[in-house]
Amino acid sequence: MGRSIQSSKMLYILILIVGVSTLYFVIPSVTIAEETPQTFLTHTGLVITTTGDVIDPIGYDGKALDFDPAKFMKSFDYGQVSVLEDGTILREFYITARDDQIMEVSPGVFYNVWTFNDSVPGPTIRATEGDLIRIHFTNEGSKPHSLHFHGIHKAEMDGVFESIGTGGKFTYEFYAEPVGLHLYHCHVHPVEEHIAHGLYGAYIVDPKEGRDSADEFVFVLNGLDTDFDGENNFYAANTIPFYYQHHPIEISTNQKIRAYVVNVLEFDAVNNFHLHGTLFHHYPAGTDSVPSGYNDMLTMSQGDRQILEFSYKYPGLYMFHAHNTEFSEKGWVSTFLAKETADDFDNKVEYDDII
């Protein structure tokens, strides 16, 4: 009886092994469908071919968003200006939050951005010290949002505990102080998610006596976690990776350049800014009229701001970028094209030759 049971078990195991072996030899004969390359026309007119999945913004239940980094870096929103009876300058701004928009951040790569006034970053708000700032905020998003400004203001204007629900409105009011380069962003939890998706912008407070003449630019340093794994896939100055590498920023030699640099990078503890071919005076947060140093390299933590002032002695193409190699190779690399005059320069080195 025992031997019979053992024999039956051995026969069962033998059949199972043979069956598995048979399956093993059958599997290779199965034809696996190959991925079919797709041709895709981006909104910029570039045609790409890919075997991966392409998210078509037209078919996505959201609003496609175009963003121009060249325009953004030179745009300052001074608000609607009026004068109160006591002589105070009132600046009124209208900011709308949305969270259903799609931006093509790289050819064929689309990202669900959350925006202030249909832009990432949001508008650069600018005022003079002592001005009364009044911001009419509307939330047209599907999630609660708010506005939190760095600077000096009353607790009820801090935008932390009073989140604004869908369809809600709130008016923020405070005086522009102190002088410097500040930051504003959504402060609804999880704050990391709201900032990473794009709800932030720069806020500049000028001194009453004004600033020296300069060619001014705004650079908001950010990243994009396009696969939502808590790590950035792209890095940039003003959202679009490699933009200013392919579209050099034209400046004049011996002209003072003033760069307002704001770091809003999430998921990475620090970011940095390295300038080629010259050095800059830097003013942390721009709150002091005396520069804290003269360098070609800055390291910034999350939320840090710096005002940089510099000029180029010699004409040519100069790079500025993150000295963290990973960041620069994933998009945070840009260029200045210094010309002898703003209108006419016989460039000895063609940009296309360098690429």
Q: Where do the language-model regions lie?
A:
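Copper-binding active sites and cupredoxin-like electron-transfer domains
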Residues: 2-355
